[in-house]
Amino acid sequence: MQDRNLIDVNLTSEMKTSFIDYAMSVIVARALPDVRDGLKPVHRRILYGMNELGVTPDKPHKKSARITGDVMGKYHPHGDSSIYEAMVRMAQWWSYRHMLVDGHGNFGSMDGDGAAAQRYTEARMSKIALELLRDINKNTVNFQDNYDGSEREPVVLPARFPNLLVNGATGIAVGMATNIPPHNLAESIDAVKMVMEHPDCTTRELMEVIPGPDFPTGALVMGRSGIHRAYDTGKGSIVLRSRTEIETTQTGRERIVVTEFPYGVNKTKVHEHIVRLAQEKRLEGITAVRDESSREGVRFVIEIRREASATVILNNLFKLTSLQTNFSFNMLAIENGVPKILSLRQIIDNYISHQKEVIIRRTRFDKDKAEARAHILEGLLIALDHLDEVIAIIRNSETDVIAQTELMSRFDLSERQSQAILDMRLRRLTGLERDKIQSEYDDLLALIADLSDILAKPERIITIIKEEMDEIKRKYANPRRTELMVGEVLSLEDEDLIEEEDVLITLSNKGYIKRLAQDEFRAQKRGGRGVQGTGVNNDDFVRELVSTSTHDTLLFFTNFGRVYRLKAYEIPEYGRTAKGLPIVNLLKLEDGETIQTIINARKEETAGKSFFFTTKQGIVKRTEVSEFNNIRQNGLRALKLKEGDQLINVLLTSGQDDIIIGTHSGYSVRFNEASIRNMGRSATGVRGVKLREDDRVVGASRIQDNQEVLVITENGFGKRTSATDYPTKGRGGKGIKTANITPKNGQLAGLVTVDGTEDIMVITNKGVIIRTNVANISQTGRATLGVKIMKLDADAKIVTFTLVQPEDSSIAEINTDRENSISKNKDN
């Protein structure tokens, strides 16, 4: 026999239907707040239950278990733990901007400590919570049956202040979640008033009175663009940063003191995280972490090692720990029974509509009550005006029903009026009592007229809402706790996490680069160039040495006419004897592309200056440094090269420097760079020297009359000549002889200007490296053969040379003044 209680259903359709029902139940009845009062059902039921229980601010606290049990039994049959946890949260100053529950006992801490069991704690409503329920007994909101029909509960509270904005909301439903930040009470009320006064106001205008969230734990909001986006769309993200200060102890050491944490951050977990970072050596320089918080406020201390930078450590803490967090807006709330993501303006509009309805319903309630009372008083006045006749009717009636009927018939009274006359005490028959009744009746008529006027004039309703909110603002508002920082500081750059210190950057002839701590040497002039025993292999040497800061930007110019950029801290640090890292691991160089020049692009040293480019085919170009402010990761074209041409070097010039260019066939030309106008990056340039057939440029330098011109030929001959022997002429000429080229000495391998104290590193086509001091090379005239400076094998030729600091000179002798950071040798 088939059981009639069993119903066959399709599992798929039943799952869909049941899950949708479950999801909507969670969304509407549990997890999301109502846009009108900003409360989820559990919070609304707790507050209403406490109000019905009489646990108001003027009454003693009651056991939390009593409140929880009452709410669970009457309104919220979902377990006592969820009710108690919701009530506890409403009593925590770090959770609610304005607490709705006044807790007595252990209600937890911002360190993550849980509240004591509900049998130990007590609670009552806070004063401001009464404003959410004010006038609830005046038919201001709709009521509905509770879960079993035994009680009635409000669908929404009157909410005389915009609680959804003031205290925010968080909740996870099925397939959706809400995250609305708390705001300042005064600012929220002002925003509501602005919309009522100026219905066309924009989000930007609203932000003039409600500039952003105001979290109970304070802290800093970095930037305002995220706030505007969230207010405009209901979604967005902001950066919250702890309020910190750096103190200096009596012993001169620094410490970081945190006085405010971002909203929702667990102080104990931050403490544990910092200790773990220090132990794992991911964050160095921290010696101790202490929580010195007390009743006076939060004080979280991070002790710093003496030689460490507190600023750098703090920036690392912001990046690695919850001292800086993101708050993601998702302003989802129930609007007309439907979950919806709302903008700030929509939240305010919904609140205003709710308040209008509350005021209208309250006014109607008061008007109906006043009219009912006036109706009674009107009957009493009629009776007093005909007192003798009324008394006679009553005395002559056998029953009160007959008396009531006679009164209604004789004086055209209603049933309620006639009953009030019968219930009237004899003492009210005095003349004095009549005057009181008349006075009350007149007052009621005036009140009824006023209430009718309110209902007839929407502008009066708006005025009442504003006046009552102003009173709440006066009583409960307090200063903003969260500071809104101007500007966008939404992320920390790597530079913020690196301590600024002086370093040396070296590049070897074979393309190995490394960073060395400045204390590897005693001193080094910024922008200087040279070498000092850096331990590279015998077949390699340091060709470029730049003294700089870890925060400085270095520009790398290549033979292909491209320029790349690196921050000094991006170059790996090695010991003095280490080989370093191939430059191709840091820069995306093409096959055959090599670094010709490294220049420190520190702004104060390059401001107003130009880069002077010289190519193998004698083309020169001058371009302002500012043209190279934005260089992509894969480099940028510094100048346009003709086919077969290559960039020889780049000089940093003032715009008025003399330049000398030397050619392979032994000629040179000297001219002032002012004869060349500044050109853009994409320009090719102009002729700097007119080359003879099969000739090419082998060197270019800035030149001053107190310097010397050093030339070295392929067969190992060299000479120094005074710069005064090279007259300044126009650019583009064939030049004058700088060396007498013969088969004996060979063609020119290179030309530089020197001061006479430098060393040179000479490289042959066999890979042999020879080092000598410039002072060992004879000083002769311009058009001379030169002298033999080194012996070469029969088939060996010198292919290039470079200047370096002399081995027997101390780098400590080099001036470290930042203002003179570009050494003369840097541009040679």
From Swiss-Prot:
Any one GO biological process: DNA topological change
Enzyme class: isomerase
Every Topo IIA-type catalytic domain range: 32-497
Molecular functions (GO terms): ATP binding; DNA binding; DNA negative supercoiling activity
UniProtKB keywords: ATP-binding, Cytoplasm, DNA-binding, Isomerase, Nucleotide-binding, Topoisomerase
Main location (coarse class): cytoplasm
Active site (catalytic residues): 120 (o-(5'-phospho-dna)-tyrosine intermediate)
Protein task: A type II topoisomerase that negatively supercoils closed circular double-stranded (ds) DNA in an ATP-dependent manner to modulate DNA topology and maintain chromosomes in an underwound state. Negative supercoiling favors strand separation, and DNA replication, transcription, recombination and repair, all of which involve strand separation. Also able to catalyze the interconversion of other topological isomers of dsDNA rings, including catenanes and knotted rings. Type II topoisomerases break and join 2 DNA strands simultaneously in an ATP-dependent manner.
Positions of short motif GyrA-box: 524-530
Subunit text: Heterotetramer, composed of two GyrA and two GyrB chains. In the heterotetramer, GyrA contains the active site tyrosine that forms a transient covalent intermediate with DNA, while GyrB binds cofactors and catalyzes ATP hydrolysis.
Gene this protein is translated from: gyrA
Note: Few gyrases are as efficient as E.coli at forming negative supercoils. Not all organisms have 2 type II topoisomerases; in organisms with a single type II topoisomerase this enzyme also has to decatenate newly replicated chromosomes.
CDD domains documented for this protein: TOP4c
Subcellular location: Cytoplasm
Family: Belongs to the type II topoisomerase GyrA/ParC subunit family.
Protein name, entry field: DNA gyrase subunit A
Entries under Pfam families matching the protein: DNA_gyraseA_C, DNA_topoisoIV
